Structure formats: C-alpha cells, structure tokens
Amino acid sequence: GLNGDAFEIWAKHIPLRAVDKHRDNLFQIEAIFFGQAGILADKDGDEYYLKLKREYEYLAHKFSLTPMDVSHWRFLRLRPNNFPHIRIAQLACLYHRSYHLLSQLMEKNSLKEIRDVLRGGTSEYWVNHYTFGGSSISRPKTLSDSSLDLLVINTVVTFLYAYGIHKGDERLCARATAFLEELKPENNYIIRMWKQCGLNVAHAGDSQALIQLKKEYCDKK
C-alpha cells in the first residue's frame, strides 16, 4: 500500500518490551504508537492530542525513545478509513485487547474466528475522528472483511505456515493452506494481468502463487 514502507519503518521504532509493560493501558499504547510515528510533534492540538503528547514525552524519557520522521507518511489519494492515524489506532486497540495474540491465532480453526480476533476497533476518540483535530460523523473504525482477508493472507497464513515448518507441525501448515484456498483471490493489477492471459484464479492460494511468479520471473529480468 501507499504507506507500506512507512509502516515498516514505524514497526522498527516500536519498543515491544516497553509497550508490553503498558499493555493494559490503551491510552499509553496509543501515546507510544503515535509518538513513535512522529505524529505527536506539533505543539498545538485538541485536548486529546495534547494529553497523548504529554504522556508520550513522559514515556519517551522513561524508555529513551526516538520517533521516526513524520515525512514518511502519505495522505494523498487515501480514503479517510485508511489514514495512518486510523490504522495506528486500530493496531493499538488490537495490541491492547489481544494478549497472547499469536497463540490465539494458532488455536483458531475457522476464518470467522480469526477475523473476529483481528477485527479490533479503536478507542472512543477515533469513533468520530480520522485525524487529530476536526471531528467527523460518529462511525466505528473496524476493519472491513476485505481488509481482514488481506491481513490473513499476508500475515496470518504466512506466520502459521512458517511456524508449522519450524515446529514440524503439519497440521498448522495444512490449516494455513486451507485458509488460502478458502479465501477469495486478491484483486490487483497483477492478478488482472494474469486473468487477461486466460489463467483461472480460483482462490487466494492461486493469486499468491501468481504474484510470486511475477516477482521471481518478471520483475528480476
């Protein structure tokens, strides 16, 4: 996505040991997450912003944190639901609610159960905000099924299969493969290109294979 590189940089700036000490406090998780994203650098803002900023400054001093440069984030051509603020707020809420998240995901046997774990939400502030400041119509900011499915394809399935290989657990590998075959194929320009060549793309397993073929045999030429 547009902010894929920015989120990778952000993830490397998140001190998980420090965050884990404050897992039971969503406000403090938000302070670290937004602060490390460089989004709390402005001096002025609404009441919630200023509270987060003060909390981040305290935690940054406590854990010797250094934020990323805010210039990495992109907003043009993004729908409000995809703004970095909303995604970070959703991740903070998921981290807060989902203790032992990986073990939870390994225990789930259906896509519905996995979607329910990942669907998340946000703190109350983000119900009627897309960024800090101006309010919007109240609307819960949960992930759509299509967004959840992309998360499952690119994160959960990959983790389950790799962990299954690492542990020699064929059941985990089989479950990961079954999830891919149950999910609809991605709809992007790579898959549309393959379809134009006459290939049948039945499920996400097919689309992932075709994306990998393009990366290995087309992009490297």
Indicate where each model-derived feature is located.
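Cysteine-cluster motifs in flexible loop/terminal segments that predominantly coordinate metals
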Residues: 209-221
